[in-house]
Amino acid sequence: MQNQRIRIRLKAFDHRLIDQSTAEIVETAKRAGAQVRGPIPLPTRKERFTVLISPHVNKDARDQYEIRTHKRLVDIVEPTEKTVDALMRLDLAAGVDVQISLG
């Protein structure tokens, strides 16, 4: 697996959960002997929703909600077979979306 890299993108609503997951990935990759670049924080996506709280009158009465999607990027440069096996066995939290690409 020479001259390859593994790019891991993580998404989560809870920033503590995503930081914990990236720390586990980085620690596992370093223990397996790979060179790691990251975690790189990507821009957080903020979605805002405005809801009318009055069913009939009082148009100015509204509630606003927001949900934030936190993202991180981890690059593993020149991974070995041991690194890939260790990452495959890694069990991450349920609230984290993981996308892996080889390049």
Swiss-Prot record:
Sample GO molecular function, one term: tRNA binding
Pfam families: Ribosomal_S10
The UniProt record lists the keyword Ribonucleoprotein: yes
Disulfide links within the chain: none
PROSITE patterns tied to this protein: RIBOSOMAL_S10
Gene Ontology cellular component terms for the protein in this record: ribonucleoprotein complex; ribosome
Superkingdom of source: Bacteria
UniProt record, GO biological process: translation
Keyword set, alphabetical order: Ribonucleoprotein, Ribosomal protein
Family, similarity comment: Belongs to the universal ribosomal protein uS10 family.
Listed PANTHER family: 30S RIBOSOMAL PROTEIN S10 FAMILY MEMBER (PTHR11700)
Function recorded in the entry: Involved in the binding of tRNA to the ribosomes.
HAMAP family: Ribosomal_uS10
Subunit structure: Part of the 30S ribosomal subunit.
Protein name: Small ribosomal subunit protein uS10
Source species: Haemophilus ducreyi (strain 35000HP / ATCC 700724)
